[in-house]
Swiss-Prot record:
Its EC number is 1.14.13.127. The lineage of its organism: Bacteria, Bacillati, Actinomycetota, Actinomycetes, Mycobacteriales. FAD binds at residues 13-42, 278-288. GO terms for molecular function: 3-(3-hydroxyphenyl)propionate hydroxylase activity; FAD binding. One of its GO terms (biological process) is 3-(3-hydroxy)phenylpropionate catabolic process. It is an enzyme of class 1 (oxidoreductase). InterPro entries: 3-HPP/3HCI_hydroxylase, FAD-bd, FAD/NAD-bd_sf, PheA/TfdB_FAD_monoxygenase. Catalyzes the insertion of one atom of molecular oxygen into position 2 of the phenyl ring of 3-(3-hydroxyphenyl)propionate (3-HPP) and hydroxycinnamic acid (3HCI). Pathway: Aromatic compound metabolism; 3-phenylpropanoate degradation. Belongs to the PheA/TfdB FAD monooxygenase family. Keywords: Aromatic hydrocarbons catabolism, FAD, Flavoprotein, NAD, Oxidoreductase. It comes from Mycobacterium sp. (strain JLS). This is 3-(3-hydroxy-phenyl)propionate/3-hydroxycinnamic acid hydroxylase. Pfam families: FAD_binding_3. The gene is mhpA. The keyword Transmembrane does not apply.
Length: 568
């Protein structure tokens, strides 16, 4: 059955269960690719209170790719510093990562309801994307070529090719799939209180590793501050939610707790869990439905956005006929290992922060202070080098031999600012577009690949980019109408290629390096990639590249970048 025929036999291509940030991001990715998408959400509207409070550089890069980063940025606090204090309020450690190698700051406070609202508003660009509010998925039956979804209160089933459960930790999709959710739930409880008209007012965040009562104080944006306090074992949930108790907790950090304006408060526990499979047949899990982690690294929200970025382009390629269904198996292969690493890191940091035994806390403090006098260890913490970065050894990547720790294939490519002949000081992804890209240093991709392979990538909607020193930008000796020439404005591209032997990169739509090689090996690596990416010979049925309803919304070339998106 051809993809076009399958599209005629279904009501939509992809059903997404859940209109949270992961489902909304995935719907925007699919919408940009011309994929018919339906979100079903049992709530009547978006959740209007904050849950996540931190965005990282990878999430902002994804929002850039879907053309919404300019809408999101006003609701963020970029380059947010996080400080850790001991029980005597002496500084233990500080996280202030200075670089923006992926185009955006590594740490950003944000107001989740406002960002989610922008993600939802972005769907209005796509007539082929629909959100059904107030509809709960009752059941989902898989058939040979799709899924049939039944919604409560609607007698007409929805037929789709694939279903993605983005429906949270209590995922109905996961239960219907019969997938386990292994892990642990911490016995420790926390009181979270969100405050309007920030009573402290400073722009950064802190964690108090006080054995008497660990706490967190987080600046979000728009005058909102979040406080979190550990609840002792002898304190009940009812006590913790009593206004007098809340005022007593706030009084530890605020001079007049009775004057604060509480947005909401609740008691919660930390979960460290991961689904037994992210894919089963034509059904997938993403976000909290696939994994839950403690809040200490602020990676729950960001890990879900990574899921959407990884799965979205693969679904679009398969639905459009540009790739075979086997490409979708790489979603689980690639995302599971990294999600597990994030869970383990977040769990470990929580254990470091929250011991209530004073002797254990004292030993911890001495170890951290001892490490801080070693420059390499201090930079390791300051620059957040401990954060696990995706490095795919298997999946939709090609390694000609066993990957080494320095192999670029399977890693996320940098995003410096560059000049083209049409624009100056733009982020690299604005030139690369939102599909596949072939990027080489100081060479012509057509000459390296040969006509047949070049045309095959072109049929898949790939962009071809030749990076040069800025001094060579306007030299026209090797001009090619299908190749965009960029000038290395900051020297970051030359620095990257100088540090690696590879000079030709094949970039996936999520900007992961699918394959890399020296110039002479470009044809053989290209051919191998068509295999591991399960790409089709014909190039699909025309919904990629310039035929998409919206490719991207370019960011302003004059945007100040020193504090937000890298130094020009």
């Amino acid at each position: 059955m051809t993809p076009a025929t399958e599209r005629d036999d279904t009501d939509t291509d992809v059903v997404i269960v859940g209109a949270g940030p992961v489902g909304l991001t995935l719907a925007n990715i699919l919408g940009l690719q011309g994929v018919r998408t339906m979100i079903v959400e049992e709530r009547a509207t978006l959740i209007d209170y904050p849950r996540g409070v931190g965005l990282d550089d990878e999430a902002l890069r994804t929002f850039q790719a879907i053309g919404l980063v300019d809408k999101v940025l006003p609701h963020t606090v970029p380059n947010q510093i996080l400080r850790f204090f001991d029980g005597n309020r002496r500084l233990l450690a500080e996280m202030a990562p200075p670089d923006a190698r992926f185009g955006w700051p590594k740490r950003n406070g944000f107001v989740q309801p406002m960002v989610d609202a922008e993600l939802h508003a972005g769907l209005a660009r796509f007539p082929h994307v629909e959100v059904r509010w107030g509809h709960r998925m009752a059941e989902c039956e898989e058939t040979a070529d799709g899924v049939t979804v039944r919604l409560d209160g609607d007698p007409t089933p929805v037929r789709a090719r694939y279903l993605v459960g983005c429906d949270g930790g209590r995922s109905a999709t996961r239960r219907l799939m019969g997938v386990s959710f292994d892990g642990t739930t911490s016995p420790t409880r926390w009181l979270v209180v969100d405050i309007a008209n920030d009573p402290l007012g400073h722009p950064n965040s802190e964690v108090g590793a006080d054995p008497a009562r660990p706490y967190a104080s987080i600046s979000i944006a728009h005058g909102i501050r979040r406080f979190e306090f550990m609840i002792h074992a002898d304190e009940t949930d009812e006590q913790a939610e009593d206004p007098a108790f809340i005022h007593r907790m706030l009084g530890l950090l605020v001079p007049h707790p009775e004057r604060v304006e509480v947005i909401r408060h609740r008691v919660y526990t930390h979960h460290s869990r991961i689904a037994g499979a992210f894919r089963k047949g034509r059904m997938f899990l993403a976000g909290d439905a696939a994994h839950l982690m403690p809040v200490w690294q602020g990676q729950g929200y960001n890990s879900g956005i990574r899921d959407a970025a990884n799965l979205g382009w693969k679904l679009a390629a398969v639905v459009d006929g540009r790739a075979g269904d086997a490409l979708l198996d790489t979603y689980d292969v690639e995302r599971r290992k990294h999600a597990r690493a994030m869970i383990d890191l977040s769990t470990m940091v929580g254990r470091v922060i929250s011991p209530t035994n004073r002797h254990v806390a004292a030993v911890r403090d001495k170890l951290i202070r001892g490490a801080s006098v070693v420059p390499t260890l201090k930079r390791y913490v300051l620059e957040m080098r401990f954060k696990p970065m995706p490095r795919y050894e298997q999946g939709a990547v090609f390694h000609p031999e066993a990957p080494s720790p320095t192999s670029p294939a399977g890693t996320l490519f940098i995003q410096p600012r560059v000049d083209s002949r049409d624009a100056q000081n733009v982020l690299l992804d604005e030139v690369l577009g939102t599909g596949f890209a072939v990027l080489c240093w100081n060479n012509n991709p057509r000459a390296l690949l040969g006509a047949d392979l070049f045309d095959r990538w072109k049929a898949l909607g790939a962009r071809f980019v030749a990076a040069r020193p800025l001094t060579q930008l306007h030299w026209t000796g090797h001009d090619d109408p299908d190749v965009t020439v960029i000038g290395d404005r900051t020297g970051a591209l030359k620095g990257w290629f100088d540090a690696h032997a590879e000079s030709v990169l094949f970039l996936r739509p999520d900007r992961c390096i699918a394959g890399a090689c020296i110039a002479q090996r470009a044809p053989e690596v290209s051919t191998a990639l068509f295999g591991v990416l399960h790409l089709t010979q014909g190039g699909g049925n025309g919904h990629h590249g310039a035929d998409r309803p919206v490719l991207h919304v370019a960011q302003s070339a004059t945007e100040p970048s020193g504090t937000v998106a890298g130094t020009p």
